[in-house]
Amino acid sequence: MRLILWLPVLVVVLLMVLEGPAPAQGAPDIAGTFRNIPNSLKEFGNNLKDAFESIPEATRKLMTSFAEGLKNFRIPMV
């Protein structure tokens, strides 16, 4: 009985092994990777520049809201 249950499993495993690697698992194209490095670095630099340019505005908004909160703060009288 066990042999009958294991035969389909064995067939599926053998088919998977004999099929070979999937295209996503194939060897990467090293030359293409090296060609894409400058574009990736430029995109990273642009993203970093945008992030740093938004820091002063975000800080200004945070400080303004904090100052408004302090203006409206009342100490309760007991």
From Swiss-Prot:
Instruction: Identify a single GO molecular function assigned to this protein.
Output: fatty acid binding
Instruction: Indicate yes or no for the key word Secreted.
Output: yes
Record flagged with keyword Secreted: yes
Going by the entry's taxonomy, the superkingdom of the source organism is recorded as Eukaryota
Q: Which residues form the signal peptide?
A: 1-26
Per the record, what is one GO cellular component?
A: high-density lipoprotein particle
Q: Where in the cell is it found?
A: Secreted
Alphabetized, the UniProt keywords read: Lipid transport, Secreted, Signal, Transport, VLDL
Gene Ontology annotations of biological process type: lipid transport; lipoprotein metabolic process; negative regulation of cholesterol transport; negative regulation of lipid catabolic process; negative regulation of very-low-density lipoprotein particle clearance; triglyceride metabolic process; very-low-density lipoprotein particle clearance
InterPro entries cross-referenced by the UniProt entry = ApoC-I (IPR006781)
Protein family (similarity comment): Belongs to the apolipoprotein C1 family.
Which protein, by its recorded name, is this? Apolipoprotein C-I
| Organism (species) | Puma concolor
Q: What is the lineage of its organism?
A: Eukaryota, Metazoa, Chordata, Craniata, Vertebrata
